[in-house]
Regions:
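FAD-binding subdomain of flavoenzyme oxidoreductases
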Residues: 106-262
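C-terminal substrate-recognition/cap domain of FAD-linked oxidoreductases
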Residues: 22-38, 243-371
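Soluble FAD-dependent oxygen oxidases
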Residues: 12, 37, 43-77, 117, ...
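Residue-level detector of anion-binding/catalytic polar loops
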Residues: 75-76, 139, 257, 311
């Protein structure tokens, strides 16, 4: 027989303490959704079952005890940290679910310069870890647009990819080791070693599991030298997307690794670069790192783009200004809410993966449907 809502709350309070179990209705409503439902959220409309409680977890041991209890009584759990997700994965679609909030597990455990690794609990905001590293001259190399909001556990659980992935890779390329708690409360740890010599890489069972298989409590990621003084910015306007895709392919095939490589169509370019796009497509690159490598990368980009006479370079300062305003923090989220209320319009980003041979066809098919 399943436990009642009240019984679930009472037993959770016994496990973690009453101060860590939140049952305020406003909080429960907010925690029944993620940013996929930002339009109804802005209008105060919540149609999903609200959770029985939100638990502010404080340690791996607490996560283990809570999951053991929930597993025994078949209670649905929704792991949550920064809550910046936009895919509906944080919704409490099952009655009397419990939201497992790890944002209070927010300690940076170790910054290991010799081994070029940083270890943090699941609730450490990426921006906090990044700032701590930058003070020492290092970086994670991971920079999704949600950097001011996202936290380390969620980034790994959702297989996050950042804006510098062409150079540094995605989160799955950065994770060295981790700690996680399975559904029955068993704590498992994957060691921080550079390579496994045999068997499947079990990190990839956990990375991207979306909270369905386990609760990630601790993460160790690679770190890199941070040298923003060497950043080189390149921006071009061009007539068509096909040319842009060809340029991107040539740069990658030649072995260059800019940290940023972006192509905007005319509509998107006009939205982001009204001051110079002039109704054309926009191609953007950034080279960074060791000054010799950055210089060689920049020269390679310029040489390849020069093979396409239709491309017109724009002032690098324009691209640098764009770069410095990429991320979405609380201020931009608040401003977006005001704009949605005012206009009734909103947008989402959809990520698509495709090979060089099909990516332009995918683009044309999608944009023709939209238009």
């Amino acid at each position: 027989m399943s436990l009642s809502r009240a019984a679930i709350v009472d037993q959770l309070k016994e496990i973690v303490g009453a101060d860590r179990v939140i049952t305020d209705e406003t909080v429960l409503k907010k925690n029944s959704i993620d940013r996929f439902r930002k339009f109804p959220d802005i209008h105060g409309i919540y149609t999903l079952p609200i959770p029985a409680a939100v638990i502010k977890l404080g340690s791996t041991e607490q996560v283990s005890r809570v999951l053991n209890f929930m597993n025994a009584h078949k209670i649905n759990g929704v792991p949550r940290t920064g809550a910046s997700a936009t895919e509906g994965g944080l919704e409490t679609v099952v009655e009397n679910s419990v939201v497992l909030d790890g944002s209070a597990m927010n300690q940076i455990i170790n910054i290991d310069i010799e081994n070029m690794q940083a270890t943090a609990q699941c609730g450490v905001p990426l921006e906090v870890l990044e700032n701590a590293l930058r003070e020492k001259g290092y970086t994670t190399g991971h920079s999704p647009q949600s950097k001011p909001l996202a936290q380390m556990g969620g980034l790994v659980a959702t297989r996050s990819i950042g804006q510098f992935s062409t150079l540094y890779g995605a989160i799955e390329d950065m994770v060295v080791g981790l700690e996680a708690v399975l559904a029955d409360g068993t704590v498992t740890r994957i060691k921080n070693v550079p390579r496994r010599a045999a068997g499947p890489d079990i990190r990839h069972i956990i990375i991207g599991n979306e909270g369905a298989l386990c609760y990630i409590t601790e993460v160790t990621v690679k770190i890199f030298k941070f040298t923003p003084e060497n950043n080189l910015f390149y921006g071009y306007i061009l007539e068509d997307m096909k040319t842009g895709f060809n340029i991107l392919r040539e740069i990658m095939v030649e072995g260059y690794r800019p940290s940023i490589a972006r192509l905007y169509d005319a509509e998107d370019g006009t939205q982001h670069f009204t001051h110079f796009a002039d109704g054309k497509c926009v191609l953007i690159f950034m080279a960074e790192g060791n000054p010799r490598i950055a210089k060689a990368t920049g020269e390679g980009i310029a040489e390849i783009v020069a093979r396409y006479p239709q491309c017109q370079r724009v002032d690098s300062k324009l691209i640098e200004t764009w770069f410095n305003n990429l991320n979405w923090g609380p201020d931009k989220v608040a401003a977006e809410r005001v704009q949605i209320l005012k206009t009734g319009n909103m947008g989402f980003t959809t990520e698509v993966s495709g090979c060089w041979s099909c990516i332009h066809e995918i683009y044309e098919s999608v944009i023709n449907r939209i238009r």
